[in-house]
Amino acid sequence: MASVLEKVLRVGEGRTLRKLQNYAKAVNQLEEDFTHLTDEELKNETVELRERHANGESLDDLLPEAFAAVREASRRTLGLRHFDVQIMGGAALHLGNIAEMKTGEGKTLVATLPAYLNAIASRGVHVITVNDYLASYQSELMGRVFRALGMTTGVILAGQTPQQRREQYAADITYGTNNEFGFDYLRDNMAWQASDMVQRGHFFAVVDEVDSILIDEARTPLIISGPSAGDANRWFTEFANVAKRLVPEVDYEVDEKKRTVGVLETGIEKVEDHLGIDNLYESANTPLISFLNNSIKAKALFKKDKDYVVMNGEVLIVDEHTGRILMGRRYNEGIHQAIEAKEGVAVKAENQTLATVTLQNYFRLYKKLSGMTGTAETEAAEFMSTYKLGVVPIPTNRPMQRKDQSDLIYKNEKAKFEQVVEDIAERHAAGQPVLVGTTSVEKSEYLSKLLAKKGVRHEVLNAKNHAREAAIVAQAGHLGSVTVATNMAGRGTDIMLGGNAEFLAVAAMNARGLSPVETPEQYETEWDDVFAQVKAEVDEEAAKVIEAGGLYVLGTERHESRRIDNQLRGRSGRQGDPGESRFYLSLTDDLMRLFNNGAAASLMGRDSVPDDVAIESKVVSRAIRSAQGQVEARNAEIRKNVLKYDDVLNRQREAIYGDRRHILEGDDLQERSQRFLEAVIDDVLDSHIGEGNGDDWDFDALWTELKTLYPISITIDEVITEAGSKGRVNRDFVRREILSDAKLAYSKREEQLGEAAMRELERRVVLSVIDRRWREHLYEMDYLKDGIGLRAMAQRDPLVEYQREGFALFQQMMGAIREETVGFLFNLEVEVQAPADAESVGPRIQAKGLAANQATADKLRYTAPTDDGGVEVRNQRGQIEKAATAKAQKDQQAEDAVLVGEDEPETPQGPPARGAFGQPTGASSAPQNREERRKADRRK
C-alpha cells in the first residue's frame, strides 16, 4: 500500500516545482528594487507588509515581497544571498510541505524565508532544531537578518525560568528544540494562573531535520512526572542477582531481532527457589514477573559501551543513531533501573506521570506545519498519512559530484577494520579529509586505537566527548583531517571544505567577548572584518582540499535505517563540491547477522576467498536493502500503532486541557459548581432510589450519604410531610427538595466566605481535583494499554477494547472530579485573610490540605523520546539550571500565588466520608484500579 501511495505522491511533483519556480521568478523580479532601499526603508517593509495583511491581503500574496526583503537583509548582514533553489525551498515550507534539500544546501538560511513571512501575521513562528546548541547558534546568526527587518527573535533553552520563556515566546520568531516546545505545552496545561502560561498558541512551525524529530523520535511520548509512592528498588537489585545465575538457552531464551526474552521452565524453578515461593505466577506474585523479565533483558539485550556507558556512578544511554551520550535520558518501563542494578550503581526511583503527549500529537496542534531534511523520500507516505505533509524534493544549486562507491564486504570484523585503517592512512597522506562513521562508542574507540597505532592523527567524536562536537565537525573539512564519528545523524553543523567560515567567525567573535544580544552594535561593526578574514583563509585551504578529492566519507557498518546511511553519505559533496563515499561491511555486523538470509555467508564461505579480500556482490547488496526495509517497515508499524492508541488519550487530553484553559481564562466557576452539584446529587439518587416511590426506598441510607456530601438541613420527615405521605414521594419531588436545599447551603457557604474568596476556592479546588484525577487516569490508561494486547487471544480487537474501556475510565474520572469538587467546596476548612497589600487582587485564603499551587517544580522530571526506545529525563535544575535557580523559581511562584497554602502534600485530603473524596484517594482505591482490573482480566 505504501508503495502505491508513494507513486501517487510523486505524480504532482512536477506541477509543484513549476509553482515554486514561479515564486522564485517573482522574487527575482523584485531583487533590484530592494537593493536600492536604505536600511531604514528595508526595515519599514515589515510595517507596510503587516498593514497590508491586516487589511486583508493573504500571506501567499505577500510572499514575493517578503522573500525579496529577507534575501536583501541576508545579503547585507551575513553576506549570503539566497539562491533560487533556496527561494523555492522557502516557498515549499510556507505552503506547508517538507522540503527535501540535500546536505549543504543551506537549510538554516532557507528557514528565514517562511519564518519572516508567517511572522508578519504577529502570531508567533517556531523554528524547531535538534539540540540546544543549534537553537542558540541559529537564533544568534539568523537573528541578525530578522533584526535588520525590524523583527525580534527568541530562543528556548533548558534551564530558563518561566518569565524568561514567556519573553522568548513573545518574540516574532522563536528557536528551540522539539522537547522544549513540547514540555512548555504540557507545563502550560499544568499552570494554576493564566499568567504562568508561556506559549501563545501554535500558528506555524518549521522543523529542521524533520525526519529525525517526527519519525525517529515519534515512538516515545514526552512525559512530565513527579515522585510516586512506594519503593520497588530493592526488587531490581534482588532480580539482578537472580539474572546472573540464569544460563542462556537453559533458563531463558533471547530473540535479538524482536528484542524480547522468554523464561524457560528451569529458569522459573530457579527463581522460585531463590525467592522461596511456590508459584511465581500466582496473583500475589505477578508484579515480580516484570522485575524478572527486565533483569534478563538488561543482562542479554543491553550491552555496556554500546547501548550505554557507566560514568560517575550513573548509567548513561548512548544514542544508536548519533553516538551521543543522552544526558539524563532513561529507558522506561523499569529497564533503566534493571541496568543500574546489573551494573551495581544506585538504582533511582520511578516517577508518576503528571502530563504526557507524543510528538506526533504535539506537532498536529500547529495550524500549519512544515519541515526540512535531506532524507525524507523514504518516509513520504508516512509523512502524508500522519501529518498531512507532502514531500517536495528541491533541486540542488549545483550538480552533485560525489562518487558513491559500492560496498566492500569482508568475512569478519578484524579484516574489515584492517582495510579501513589502510584506506584512511592512504587518503590522509594525500591530504584528503576523511570522515569515518561508526555505529557505537566501542567501535569508534577500537578504530581510534588502530589509527593511533598506524600513526594517523585524528579526532574522535562520540558520546564521551560530545562537548566538543560542533567544533570538531566544523574542522572536519580541513586538509588531511581525519574525524571518527559515532554516526552523523542530526549533527546539524555543515562540514565545509577548508572549514566552516560562519562557525569559525562566530567563535572568533565570542572569543572577543562580543554577542549579538548583549553588544549588538559593536558585533555588527566588527563582524564584516572578522568574517572576511576567516573566509579568505578558508577559501585558500578549500582549493587545496578540492585538489585532493574533497571530503571522503567512510562508513564502517550499515545502519538499520537507509536514512541514517544517506545522512552520513550526504556530509560529502555539498554544493557541488567533489567528494566520495564508501561502506565497509563484514558478515559479523549486527544488521548482517540478524537479518542475513545466508546467501552472503555462502558466497563468502568459499575457501578461495581470503579474509583480507573483499567482494562486491549484488546478492549481498539486495540482502542489505531487504534487511533495512524489514526494520523500517517494523518501525513504521510501531509508530502507526502508537498513534492509534494515543489518539484515544489525545481526545481525552484535549477535553481536560480545554477545561483547564477555560478555568484559567475566567470561566464562570459558580455556574460550573452548580452543574457539578446537580450531577452529583443525581448520581447519589441513582444509587439509592429507583423509579418507584418512597415506600420502596431506604431514606436513612440516602440521607447518610447526602450528609457526607454537604450540610443537609432538611429532614426525612419534612420531605414526607411536604409530599403528604411516604408513598407520594417520587424521584422528581425528592430531587427538587434536595437540590433546593443544597443550593441554599451553597449560598450560605458563599455568604460565610465572601464572594471573592468563594470564587478563589472554586478555582483552587477544581484545578487541584482535575490535576490529581487526571494523573491517576493516566496511570490507569497506561496499565490498560499494557495488557490490552492479550484481548486478541479472545478474538477481540485490542484497539476497539482500548477505546471502549478508555472511554469508560474517562467517564468514571469525570464523575469523580464532580464528586470530589462538590465535597471539597462544602467540607474544606477555609481561613480568609485580608489582601497582603494594596496591589493584591482579592482576598487570600488558606485551605487545609489543599495545594497552594501546582506540583513543586524542583520535584518534576521531564522525559523526552529517543529513537532507540530510550527516554530523556531531566530534573528542573538539570545540567544547565543550578539548584539555586530552581529554588528561586519555586520561591517566586509561592510569592506570586494569590493563595497561601500550608507546606503539605499537594494531594487534597477530603472529609472522612464516602466516595472518591471520602475514601483513600490513591490509585489503589480508584474505580477499576490495577488490582481489580487484573482480576477482571483473569476472569476474561
UniProtKB/Swiss-Prot annotation:
Its main location: membrane. GO terms for biological process: intracellular protein transmembrane transport; protein import; protein targeting; protein transport by the Sec complex. Its EC number is 7.4.2.8. Residues 884-940 are annotated as: Disordered. GO terms for molecular function: ATP binding; protein-exporting ATPase activity. It is an enzyme of class 7 (translocase). Gene3D superfamilies: Helical scaffold and wing domains of SecA, P-loop containing nucleotide triphosphate hydrolases, SecA, preprotein cross-linking domain. The keyword Ligase does not apply. ATP binds at Q86, G104, E105, G106, K107, T108, D494. It is a peripheral membrane protein. It catalyses: ATP + H2O + cellular proteinSide 1 = ADP + phosphate + cellular proteinSide 2. SUPFAM superfamilies: Helical scaffold and wing domains of SecA, P-loop containing nucleoside triphosphate hydrolases, Pre-protein crosslinking domain of SecA. Signal peptide: none annotated. Keywords: ATP-binding, Cell membrane, Cytoplasm, Membrane, Nucleotide-binding, Protein transport, Translocase, Translocation, Transport. Residues 929-940 have a biased composition (Basic and acidic residues). It is found in: Cell membrane; Cytoplasm. GO terms for cellular component: cell envelope Sec protein transport complex; cytosol; plasma membrane. It comes from the Bacteria. Part of the Sec protein translocase complex. Interacts with the SecYEG preprotein conducting channel. Has a central role in coupling the hydrolysis of ATP to the transfer of proteins into and across the cell membrane, serving as an ATP-driven molecular motor driving the stepwise translocation of polypeptide chains across the membrane. Monomer and homodimer. Part of the essential Sec protein translocation apparatus which comprises SecA, SecYEG and auxiliary proteins SecDF. Other proteins may also be involved. Belongs to the SecA family. This is Protein translocase subunit SecA. It comes from Clavibacter sepedonicus.
